[in-house]
Regions:
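Glycine-rich flexible loops
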Residues: 2-241
Length: 241
Protein backbone atom coordinates (compact mmCIF):
# COMPACT_ATOMS: atom_id res chain seq x y z
CA UNK A 1 0.00 0.00 0.00
CA UNK A 2 1.39 3.39 -0.97
CA UNK A 3 2.06 5.97 1.74
CA UNK A 4 0.36 9.36 1.91
CA UNK A 5 3.74 10.96 1.19
CA UNK A 6 4.09 8.97 -2.03
CA UNK A 7 0.55 9.83 -3.07
CA UNK A 8 1.21 13.49 -2.34
CA UNK A 9 4.36 13.40 -4.45
CA UNK A 10 2.42 11.84 -7.32
CA UNK A 11 -0.21 14.58 -7.12
CA UNK A 12 2.48 17.26 -7.14
CA UNK A 13 4.11 15.65 -10.17
CA UNK A 14 0.75 15.61 -11.94
CA UNK A 15 0.31 19.31 -11.17
CA UNK A 16 3.78 20.09 -12.55
CA UNK A 17 2.91 18.25 -15.74
CA UNK A 18 -0.42 20.06 -16.05
CA UNK A 19 1.20 23.47 -15.51
CA UNK A 20 3.89 22.63 -18.07
CA UNK A 21 1.26 21.64 -20.64
CA UNK A 22 -0.81 24.72 -19.81
CA UNK A 23 2.17 26.98 -20.50
CA UNK A 24 2.66 25.27 -23.87
CA UNK A 25 -1.01 25.99 -24.62
CA UNK A 26 -0.19 29.71 -24.54
CA UNK A 27 1.94 29.24 -27.64
CA UNK A 28 -0.46 26.81 -29.31
CA UNK A 29 -3.34 29.27 -28.88
CA UNK A 30 -1.34 32.27 -30.11
CA UNK A 31 -1.59 34.12 -26.81
CA UNK A 32 2.10 34.90 -26.35
CA UNK A 33 5.18 36.19 -28.12
CA UNK A 34 8.72 35.64 -26.82
CA UNK A 35 8.22 34.75 -23.13
CA UNK A 36 5.35 37.17 -22.44
CA UNK A 37 3.14 34.93 -20.37
CA UNK A 38 2.94 32.44 -17.54
CA UNK A 39 0.57 29.90 -16.03
CA UNK A 40 0.42 28.45 -12.53
CA UNK A 41 -1.67 25.87 -10.70
CA UNK A 42 -2.27 25.35 -6.99
CA UNK A 43 -2.46 22.29 -4.75
CA UNK A 44 -4.75 23.51 -1.98
CA UNK A 45 -4.31 20.41 0.18
CA UNK A 46 -0.54 20.84 0.34
CA UNK A 47 -0.55 24.64 0.31
CA UNK A 48 1.74 24.81 -2.72
CA UNK A 49 1.59 26.17 -6.24
CA UNK A 50 3.57 25.45 -9.40
CA UNK A 51 4.60 28.12 -11.91
CA UNK A 52 6.72 28.62 -15.01
CA UNK A 53 10.37 29.65 -14.46
CA UNK A 54 11.26 33.21 -15.42
CA UNK A 55 12.40 34.00 -18.95
CA UNK A 56 12.68 30.40 -20.17
CA UNK A 57 11.51 29.85 -23.75
CA UNK A 58 8.39 27.70 -23.95
CA UNK A 59 10.07 25.14 -26.22
CA UNK A 60 12.72 24.60 -23.54
CA UNK A 61 10.26 23.93 -20.73
CA UNK A 62 9.68 20.55 -19.09
CA UNK A 63 7.75 19.42 -16.00
CA UNK A 64 11.06 19.16 -14.14
CA UNK A 65 11.80 22.85 -14.74
CA UNK A 66 8.56 24.04 -13.13
CA UNK A 67 9.07 25.85 -9.83
CA UNK A 68 7.14 24.81 -6.71
CA UNK A 69 6.43 27.39 -4.02
CA UNK A 70 4.41 27.50 -0.83
CA UNK A 71 1.67 30.08 -0.39
CA UNK A 72 4.07 32.31 1.54
CA UNK A 73 6.16 32.61 -1.63
CA UNK A 74 9.07 30.42 -0.52
CA UNK A 75 10.58 28.06 -3.10
CA UNK A 76 9.98 24.44 -2.14
CA UNK A 77 11.37 22.76 -5.24
CA UNK A 78 13.20 23.92 -8.36
CA UNK A 79 16.60 25.25 -9.39
CA UNK A 80 15.39 28.22 -11.46
CA UNK A 81 13.87 31.54 -10.47
CA UNK A 82 10.07 31.52 -10.75
CA UNK A 83 8.21 33.91 -13.02
CA UNK A 84 8.56 37.57 -12.08
CA UNK A 85 4.75 37.62 -11.77
CA UNK A 86 4.81 34.95 -9.05
CA UNK A 87 3.82 37.36 -6.23
CA UNK A 88 0.69 38.33 -8.16
CA UNK A 89 -0.28 34.67 -8.58
CA UNK A 90 0.37 34.05 -4.88
CA UNK A 91 -1.90 36.90 -3.79
CA UNK A 92 -4.69 35.70 -6.06
CA UNK A 93 -4.44 32.17 -4.61
CA UNK A 94 -4.42 33.55 -1.08
CA UNK A 95 -7.40 35.86 -1.53
CA UNK A 96 -9.51 34.02 -4.13
CA UNK A 97 -9.82 30.65 -2.41
CA UNK A 98 -12.07 29.12 -5.08
CA UNK A 99 -9.53 29.36 -7.90
CA UNK A 100 -7.14 26.60 -8.94
CA UNK A 101 -5.06 28.19 -11.70
CA UNK A 102 -3.89 31.60 -12.91
CA UNK A 103 -2.77 32.77 -16.36
CA UNK A 104 -1.11 36.05 -17.33
CA UNK A 105 -0.48 36.98 -20.95
CA UNK A 106 0.08 40.00 -23.15
CA UNK A 107 -2.30 38.75 -25.84
CA UNK A 108 -2.76 41.55 -28.35
CA UNK A 109 -6.42 42.53 -28.19
CA UNK A 110 -6.90 41.98 -24.46
CA UNK A 111 -3.75 44.00 -23.80
CA UNK A 112 -5.18 46.84 -25.91
CA UNK A 113 -8.05 47.08 -23.42
CA UNK A 114 -5.57 47.05 -20.52
CA UNK A 115 -3.43 49.78 -22.04
CA UNK A 116 -6.45 51.92 -22.91
CA UNK A 117 -8.02 51.38 -19.50
CA UNK A 118 -11.32 50.38 -21.13
CA UNK A 119 -13.71 47.79 -19.70
CA UNK A 120 -15.08 45.08 -21.99
CA UNK A 121 -18.89 44.94 -21.76
CA UNK A 122 -20.74 41.81 -22.78
CA UNK A 123 -21.62 42.40 -26.43
CA UNK A 124 -22.89 38.94 -27.28
CA UNK A 125 -23.41 35.34 -26.28
CA UNK A 126 -19.80 34.27 -26.87
CA UNK A 127 -18.77 36.58 -24.03
CA UNK A 128 -21.72 35.49 -21.87
CA UNK A 129 -20.70 31.84 -22.16
CA UNK A 130 -17.50 32.63 -20.27
CA UNK A 131 -17.83 35.90 -18.35
CA UNK A 132 -20.84 37.03 -16.34
CA UNK A 133 -20.90 40.69 -17.30
CA UNK A 134 -18.34 43.39 -17.96
CA UNK A 135 -14.64 42.51 -17.69
CA UNK A 136 -13.26 45.14 -15.28
CA UNK A 137 -10.21 47.36 -15.46
CA UNK A 138 -8.04 47.32 -12.34
CA UNK A 139 -6.71 50.72 -11.33
CA UNK A 140 -3.18 51.78 -12.13
CA UNK A 141 -0.64 51.38 -9.35
CA UNK A 142 0.76 54.39 -7.56
CA UNK A 143 4.41 55.35 -7.76
CA UNK A 144 4.90 54.04 -4.22
CA UNK A 145 3.19 50.73 -5.02
CA UNK A 146 5.40 50.21 -8.06
CA UNK A 147 8.57 51.07 -6.15
CA UNK A 148 7.75 49.04 -3.05
CA UNK A 149 6.58 45.62 -4.29
CA UNK A 150 5.19 45.92 -7.80
CA UNK A 151 4.00 42.38 -8.43
CA UNK A 152 2.50 41.89 -4.96
CA UNK A 153 0.68 45.20 -5.22
CA UNK A 154 -0.64 44.20 -8.64
CA UNK A 155 -2.34 41.22 -7.02
CA UNK A 156 -3.65 43.33 -4.15
CA UNK A 157 -5.09 45.87 -6.60
CA UNK A 158 -6.94 43.09 -8.45
CA UNK A 159 -8.39 41.80 -5.18
CA UNK A 160 -9.33 45.35 -4.14
CA UNK A 161 -11.15 45.91 -7.44
CA UNK A 162 -13.21 42.74 -7.14
CA UNK A 163 -14.14 43.31 -3.50
CA UNK A 164 -15.02 46.98 -3.94
CA UNK A 165 -17.35 46.15 -6.83
CA UNK A 166 -18.76 42.95 -5.34
CA UNK A 167 -17.47 40.82 -8.22
CA UNK A 168 -17.25 37.07 -7.67
CA UNK A 169 -13.94 35.73 -9.06
CA UNK A 170 -15.41 32.55 -10.51
CA UNK A 171 -18.21 34.45 -12.24
CA UNK A 172 -15.74 36.93 -13.71
CA UNK A 173 -12.46 35.00 -14.09
CA UNK A 174 -10.62 37.84 -15.82
CA UNK A 175 -9.49 41.44 -15.52
CA UNK A 176 -7.45 44.06 -17.33
CA UNK A 177 -4.60 45.52 -15.27
CA UNK A 178 -4.41 49.14 -16.42
CA UNK A 179 -1.32 49.93 -18.53
CA UNK A 180 -0.19 46.32 -18.15
CA UNK A 181 -2.07 43.29 -19.49
CA UNK A 182 -4.80 40.76 -18.65
CA UNK A 183 -4.96 38.17 -15.90
CA UNK A 184 -7.35 35.22 -15.93
CA UNK A 185 -7.99 32.34 -13.56
CA UNK A 186 -10.12 29.23 -13.32
CA UNK A 187 -10.75 25.89 -11.63
CA UNK A 188 -7.34 24.64 -12.79
CA UNK A 189 -4.26 25.77 -14.67
CA UNK A 190 -5.76 24.46 -17.91
CA UNK A 191 -9.08 26.17 -17.23
CA UNK A 192 -7.32 29.49 -16.61
CA UNK A 193 -5.67 29.27 -20.04
CA UNK A 194 -9.03 28.55 -21.67
CA UNK A 195 -10.36 31.71 -20.04
CA UNK A 196 -7.42 33.64 -21.52
CA UNK A 197 -8.30 32.27 -24.95
CA UNK A 198 -11.93 33.32 -24.44
CA UNK A 199 -10.91 36.78 -23.20
CA UNK A 200 -8.67 37.41 -26.20
CA UNK A 201 -11.38 36.34 -28.65
CA UNK A 202 -14.03 38.41 -26.87
CA UNK A 203 -11.72 41.44 -26.84
CA UNK A 204 -11.19 41.10 -30.59
CA UNK A 205 -14.92 40.65 -31.15
CA UNK A 206 -15.68 43.64 -28.94
CA UNK A 207 -13.39 45.92 -30.92
CA UNK A 208 -14.89 44.71 -34.19
CA UNK A 209 -18.42 45.17 -32.87
CA UNK A 210 -17.73 48.81 -31.97
CA UNK A 211 -16.22 49.39 -35.41
CA UNK A 212 -19.40 48.13 -37.05
CA UNK A 213 -21.78 49.75 -34.57
CA UNK A 214 -20.35 52.37 -32.23
CA UNK A 215 -23.74 52.68 -30.50
CA UNK A 216 -23.94 49.01 -29.52
CA UNK A 217 -25.25 48.99 -25.95
CA UNK A 218 -24.47 45.40 -25.04
CA UNK A 219 -26.25 42.08 -24.66
CA UNK A 220 -29.64 42.27 -22.90
CA UNK A 221 -29.44 40.85 -19.38
CA UNK A 222 -31.98 38.09 -19.94
CA UNK A 223 -29.88 36.67 -22.79
CA UNK A 224 -26.63 37.12 -20.85
CA UNK A 225 -28.06 35.29 -17.84
CA UNK A 226 -29.40 32.45 -19.99
CA UNK A 227 -26.09 31.80 -21.69
CA UNK A 228 -23.98 32.13 -18.56
CA UNK A 229 -26.24 30.01 -16.35
CA UNK A 230 -26.85 27.23 -18.86
CA UNK A 231 -23.09 26.63 -18.77
CA UNK A 232 -22.15 27.59 -15.21
CA UNK A 233 -25.35 27.73 -13.13
CA UNK A 234 -26.79 25.20 -10.69
CA UNK A 235 -28.90 23.66 -13.43
CA UNK A 236 -26.25 23.86 -16.14
CA UNK A 237 -26.97 21.67 -19.14
CA UNK A 238 -24.25 22.68 -21.62
CA UNK A 239 -21.83 19.87 -22.51
CA UNK A 240 -21.67 16.32 -21.19
CA UNK A 241 -20.74 17.03 -17.58
Amino acid sequence: MRSMIELGEDMLQELKEEVWRANLMLVEEGLVRLTWGNVSGVDRDRGMFVIKPSGVAYEDLSPELMVVLDLEGEIVEGDLRPSSDTPTHRILYREFESIGGVTHTHSVHATMFSQAGVELPCQGTTHADHFCGTVPVVRELSEAEVADDYETNTGLAIVECFREHGIKPMEMPACFQKYHAPFTWGKSATDSVKNSVALEVCAQMGLGTWQLNAQQSGLPNHILDKHYLRKHGAGAYYGQG
